[in-house]
Amino acid sequence: MEDIKHYMQQLGSEARTASRAMARADTETKNKALRAIATAIRRERDTLLAANAADLEAARRHGLEPAMLDRLVLSEKGIDTMAEGLEQIAGLPDPIGEMSDFKYRPSGIQIGKMRVPLGVIGIIYEARPNVTVDAAGLCIKSGNAAILRGGSEAIQCNRALAAIVHEGLAAAALPASAVQVVATTDRAAVGELITMKDYVDVIVPRGGKGLIERISNEARIPVIKHLDGNCHVYIDESADLAKALRILENSKTQRLGTCNTAESLLVARSIAQEALPPLTAMLISKGVEIRGCSETRALVPQAKPATEEDYYTEYLAAIISVKVVADVDEAIAHINQYSSQHTEAIVTENYTNARRFLREVDSSSVIVNASTRFADGFEYGLGAEIGISTDKLHARGPVGLEGLTSLKYIVLGDGEVRA
């Protein structure tokens, strides 16, 4: 344990030193590093595929569940996507050094704000090798240093990616310690990382609810996180049914295992008799199990009874909870009680109800007449994202480059002194 503690503190010390160099780096230098990493990823395609094959073989040997195995796979297309993602990040505006909100004070001084890096970011994630590259790219562009602790299932691929990232940093004369991958699979390393408040400024966990709850409870450093994605679609009394069908189909059935997939359907009572049968028939035709309230079951004989727990549940499966509500008031109250504050959508032609939904629903993304699946950094024009935050302080919603920065006040004067 002492060896792990010493190893992690060494990583932290090196990251803190590197963060100062990254904060000074200009946009051209950072973009040069990103493009060099992208080039090396394409060149080392065979190395990465071999490393991933070794990880997959070990994972199968240890009985890793199919869903995790699926996330672990790195394909030829996945390698191209990683490289393209870095090039896209290089093409994004650099937020560092951006100045705003300048105003003169009666004393003669000028006050404004400057956007600066957070410093050292610890990122903890499970079996997705692409997160290593996405996280490294976003941290480099935003002028931060990163300590990456990927899942033990992907250790061979992550080590290979770390070598590639270091090559790209060196090509731009940036310190290799600006991006460090934790080389040990010992879980004690996570415990050390989340308590190194002298070296690490923020932790970003990406993974299952159990991992994120543990980190949130034990960290001594601020955490940017979301626990789960219990997202809702509410069909208002004025909804266009054709729109509602398209939006619900995409929100629930496009991909079952994502955090922005709809897990609960609410329908206004005044249109339930007209809307619920076709909405649920569409879902059932896609293999989705309906778990509904008594009013839902009266209209949809195939529906199973919904429990209180169902309304809190992120299924990540072909299941949806359904409830008939009186109106937009009850829909908002239900969502604010049961949701995970991730993403909620209303389908409505009523401007007043849409405005109320936007103002009163307490989630990180609130959507009118579009799919919950749009809650994504790429779709929001942020480029890649490091995660989604359902917290209210610092970053909220998809966390891209700007979410990895902070603001400091700057004061400009010409010899003024305080009276």
Curated annotation (Swiss-Prot):
CDD domains: ALDH_F18-19_ProA-GPR. It catalyses: L-glutamate 5-semialdehyde + phosphate + NADP(+) = L-glutamyl 5-phosphate + NADPH + H(+). PANTHER family: DELTA-1-PYRROLINE-5-CARBOXYLATE SYNTHASE (PTHR11063:SF8), GLUTAMATE SEMIALDEHYDE DEHYDROGENASE (PTHR11063). GO terms for molecular function: glutamate-5-semialdehyde dehydrogenase activity; NADP binding. Gene3D superfamilies: Aldehyde Dehydrogenase, Chain A, domain 1, Aldehyde Dehydrogenase, Chain A, domain 2. It holds the Pfam family Aldedh. InterPro entries: Ald_DH/histidinol_DH (IPR016161), Ald_DH_C (IPR016163), Ald_DH_N (IPR016162), Aldehyde_DH_dom (IPR015590), G-glutamylP_reductase_CS (IPR020593), Glu-5-SA_DH (IPR012134), GPR_dom (IPR000965). This is Gamma-glutamyl phosphate reductase. GO terms for cellular component: cytoplasm. It is found in: Cytoplasm. The keyword Amino-acid biosynthesis applies. Keywords: Amino-acid biosynthesis, Cytoplasm, NADP, Oxidoreductase, Proline biosynthesis. Belongs to the gamma-glutamyl phosphate reductase family. Its EC number is 1.2.1.41. Catalyzes the NADPH-dependent reduction of L-glutamate 5-phosphate into L-glutamate 5-semialdehyde and phosphate. The product spontaneously undergoes cyclization to form 1-pyrroline-5-carboxylate. Pathway: Amino-acid biosynthesis; L-proline biosynthesis; L-glutamate 5-semialdehyde from L-glutamate: step 2/2. The keyword Transmembrane helix does not apply. It comes from Methylobacillus flagellatus (strain ATCC 51484 / DSM 6875 / VKM B-1610 / KT). One of its GO terms (biological process) is L-proline biosynthetic process. Transmembrane segments: none annotated.
